[in-house]
Amino acid sequence: MALPKANRLKSRHDFQAVFREGLRRNSSHFTLRALKPSSAKKSSLDTAAKTQPADDVQDIPSTLIGVSISTKVSKRAVVRNRIKRQITAAMQQLLPRLAPGWKLVVIVKPTAAESKCGSQQFLQELEQLLAQTEVLHGHS
């Protein structure tokens, strides 16, 4: 199942910003790049919230998620698309627990295609990476 449009990281500019300034965490199958919401936007939101207290919930940006999978992972597009679908399904399950305003890019390593692991293992690895970067609510 695809991510909601409001949660998709699409623009090249956003991807470059995450790669340039974001945090990096690694696991056996993925690298997670995460860019925190900027504090300048938070302070401007706080001043706007003081003048308009009823609309402060709508001002919080949603978390944007992108998946990067190169042909080094697999030459076959069918395999790459299957892995990408599994990752987006796992991220959709984790979406309600993610802190708002983050920009996340999941980079798939070639080991993901070599090992025949399922979406359940992908979900566990992504949850662990998100907890390490402190993106999950109630991270451990």
From Swiss-Prot:
One of its GO terms (cellular component) is ribonuclease P complex. Residues 33-54 are annotated as: Disordered. Its EC number is 3.1.26.5. It comes from the Bacteria. Keywords: Endonuclease, Hydrolase, Nuclease, RNA-binding, tRNA processing. It catalyses: Endonucleolytic cleavage of RNA, removing 5'-extranucleotides from tRNA precursor. Gene3D superfamilies: 3.30.230.10. Consists of a catalytic RNA component (M1 or rnpB) and a protein subunit. Belongs to the RnpA family. This is Ribonuclease P protein component. It comes from Trichormus variabilis (strain ATCC 29413 / PCC 7937) (Anabaena variabilis). The lineage of its organism: Bacteria, Bacillati, Cyanobacteriota, Cyanophyceae, Nostocales. The gene is rnpA.
